[in-house]
Amino acid sequence: MEKTKEKAERILLEPYRYLLQLPGKQVRSKLSQAFNHWLKVPEDKLQIIIEVTEMLHNASLLIDDIEDSSKLRRGFPVAHSIYGVPSVINSANYVYFLGLEKVLTLDHPDAVKLFTRQLLELHQGQGLDIYWRDTYTCPTEEEYKAMVLQKTGGLFGLAVGLMQLFSDYKEDLKPLLDTLGLFFQIRDDYANLHSKEYSENKSFCEDLTEGKFSFPTIHAIWSRPESTQVQNILRQRTENIDIKKYCVQYLEDVGSFAYTRHTLRELEAKAYKQIEACGGNPSLVALVKHLSKMFTEENK
């Protein structure tokens, strides 16, 4: 018979394991491997750091889906629609602390400090994002970018920060991490409202249903202050496909997608420059190139 402790662990982790079996892009692992071109962290430490980052990322997705009232994740039902909200919250929080336990095995005096700081950043960013959405407050582009750096940058910063503790490479990688954090999130925002891959994979334009202020919608709202169409559509939390299609067309008409593509191209170019300044990194360049295909190819 299954031991009681093992059985309890299995039950606790089931929602988390459900999420793990969904197909993912493993971008964070690839990113850590790419940064190791410079940092040359011993393999045993690197594996622990990658595991910790993946654990925190996936646990935060479980919570995100609850906070966003999402229906689908990677084209599958969200964990809380199967296991219920209380179990999923508990499972995700449990995994945060399993991550902390793993960080302790790195056996470095600064590791826990770094872990704590980056998780605080992550929650501060997420809190702002939710506040704007739920109070119908449209942030400026600058406010939005600052929030993204806390939210997306939090986990990027954790992986690379932990790696640097075990590396002789002491260049300041924060500017590059910030560029990549913005690039990833704005690309994600664009994909959610514009890409075929996303509309088949996520419920169509889920960011509109969630009422989320994302990079293209923020541009549309601030560039056409005389119109409140986008705010009103976001406020409705609509699942109506026709309204969502109308909104996407409106974003196209007011130049928000073109502006988003332009911003992504600028961030991409900036990333290449920063990578070069740090001494070059073929695998990181390849990763950025691969992610850029989405917003370059579909507009040829």
Curated annotation (Swiss-Prot):
Keywords: Acetylation, Cytoplasm, Isoprene biosynthesis, Lipid metabolism, Magnesium, Metal-binding, Transferase. The gene is Ggps1. Mg(2+) 2 binds at D64, D68. Its EC number is 2.5.1.-, 2.5.1.1, 2.5.1.29, 2.5.1.10. It comes from Mus musculus (Mouse). This is Geranylgeranyl pyrophosphate synthase. Mg(2+) 1 binds at D64, D68. It catalyses: isopentenyl diphosphate + dimethylallyl diphosphate = (2E)-geranyl diphosphate + diphosphate; isopentenyl diphosphate + (2E)-geranyl diphosphate = (2E,6E)-farnesyl diphosphate + diphosphate; isopentenyl diphosphate + (2E,6E)-farnesyl diphosphate = (2E,6E,10E)-geranylgeranyl diphosphate + diphosphate. It is found in: Cytoplasm; Cytoplasm, Perinuclear region; Cytoplasm, Myofibril, Sarcomere, Z line. InterPro entries: Isoprenoid_synthase_dom_sf, Polyprenyl_synt, Polyprenyl_synt_CS.
